């Protein structure tokens, strides 16, 4: 089946696509892959800054080049990762292999590419990438909608602040300390 408004998995990508289109930059598969790349790159840079003896030879001037991998991330890059994933059957491992290819293109990074993803699990990457998408969407493109929703939720939390609920372990406190932090 070809993807269109009628064959989308949910109405969000189907009939509501016009209203949610701006969210694709933050919550699409492309965006998730990009955020995984960003997390892996920033983690590698952090390892270099510790400093680990094995990474002491990494020139700090290369950090901007590394960051440009995710800053200039393209659909072709995402497709390359999907192609790697079709062989590895592992989404995060495909990101790791993609970054190793990028290190090869940079030259002089052969001794360091085994430190991509060093000491991490796939969940470490996913559990950082997914919240990053929410954070960036709030900070960049969806402020109006987010402020509206947060304002409504804040009102609900105020109205229900004395209501107890089974399994409810957190208190929202006073108005303004509610579910969302809105600007």
Identify what each model region corresponds to.
Residues 1-183:
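A helix-coil-helix interface module used to build multimeric assemblies
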């Amino acid at each position: 089946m070809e993807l269109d408004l009628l064959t989308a998995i949910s109405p969000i990508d189907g009939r509501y696509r016009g209203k949610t289109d701006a969210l694709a930059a933050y919550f699409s598969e492309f965006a998730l892959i990009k955020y995984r790349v960003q997390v892996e790159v920033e983690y590698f840079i952090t390892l270099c800054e510790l400093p680990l003896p094995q990474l002491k030879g990494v020139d700090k001037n290369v950090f901007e080049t590394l960051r440009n991998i995710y800053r200039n991330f393209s659909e072709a890059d995402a497709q390359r990762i999907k192609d790697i994933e079709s062989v590895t059957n592992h989404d995060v491992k495909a990101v790791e292999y993609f970054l190793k290819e990028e290190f090869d293109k940079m030259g002089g990074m052969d001794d360091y590419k085994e430190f991509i993803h060093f000491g991490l699990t796939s969940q470490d990457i996913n559990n950082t990438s997914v919240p990053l998408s929410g954070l960036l969407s709030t900070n960049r493109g969806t402020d109006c909608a987010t402020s509206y929703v947060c304002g409504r939720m804040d009102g609900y939390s105020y109205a229900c602040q004395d209501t107890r609920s089974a399994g409810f372990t957190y208190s929202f406190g006073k108005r303004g300390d509610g579910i969302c932090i809105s600007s």
